[in-house]
Curated annotation (Swiss-Prot):
This is Maximins 6/Hv. It comes from Bombina maxima. It holds the Pfam family Bombinin. The modification Asparagine amide is found at N70. The modification Isoleucine amide is found at I143.
Length: 144
């Protein structure tokens, strides 16, 4: 009788422990799913903001390119035009990163790919802002 009692209690303890482990694993996987969904939402918002920023920069760059294309070109204006064209190509490559950098990203893991695009965006935004500033400064000087 004592042996059966010990076996039954041991079985109950083992099954209770297994259930608690199973619950821990389920709650952990639920937390991971929630974290993944949150990250997707954040990436979606960031992607939308980045897309809007790229569209605005594209529109501004196109406007500046048209302005410089219509007037007389000096050496400085020609250089600015070439930079704007390069920026436009880079912005287009950001819209289709899988096509534009397929050769560059082969063999990289996801984190390295994300770092590559972040560096590329920083590399593009710096010259774009300086070009916009210099173009607006030139326009203000001509107007004033």
């Amino acid at each position: 009788m004592n042996f059966k009692y010990i076996v039954a209690v041991s079985f109950l303890i083992a099954s209770g422990y297994a259930r608690s482990e199973e619950n821990d694993v389920q709650s952990l996987s639920q937390r991971e799913v929630l974290e993944e969904e949150t990250l997707r939402e954040i990436r979606g918002i960031g992607g939308a903001l980045l897309s809007a920023g790229k569209s605005a920069l594209k529109g501004l760059a196109k406007g500046l390119a048209e302005h410089f294309a219509n007037g007389k070109r000096t050496a400085k204006g020609h250089e600015v035009m070439k930079r704007l064209e390069a920026v436009m190509r880079d912005l287009d490559s950001l819209d289709h990163p899988e096509e534009a950098s397929e050769r560059e990203t082969r063999g990289f893991n996801q984190e390295e790919i994300a770092n590559l695009f972040t560096k590329k965006e920083k590399r593009i935004l710096g010259p774009v802002l300086s070009l916009v500033g210099s173009a607006l400064g030139g326009l203000i000087k001509k107007i004033g």
